[in-house]
Amino acid sequence: MSLDGSQASDFTLDSTAGEEVTLSETLDDGPTVVLVNRGHWCSFCAEQLQTFSEVAYDLWFHDNVDILPVVTDPVGKLTEMRDRYDLDIQLLADPDGSVADQYSGTEQTSHGLTGIAATYVIDTDGTVRYEQVADHPADRTQGNFVRYFIRNDFANPFGDG
């Protein structure tokens, strides 16, 4: 089921910054990017998060965009991941997968319950303006694409097709 064009589900999760983060509160300032990631062990997740870490300050400073990576792991594992990959963004803990379920869904893997990798760009009114759910764990939207998408009034650089 696609969420593109629909209202995003609100959520509040604990972050690696030691605070709770609520989606609706970030939307008060500007668009928000929600990334659903599989776990601290996922190299594809780390690669994607690094691309968003590289553009996060630029998006926040120039466009008031927040990046919210939701990962189906406890905060302790996410803190290790953040430090290991030198990420400049906070990670949000969704250990029971309840938020991932509202977005891209979850699946049982050899690592336990994991979120299905996905990227969402949510406008200030809560509307999902972009959705990409991975067909394969390596299938990811990168930070530069999202920056282009937001700065060009949510226009897909590859056209509508």
Each predicted region: which residue ranges?
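Chalcogenol-based redox active-site neighborhoods
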Residues: 1-161
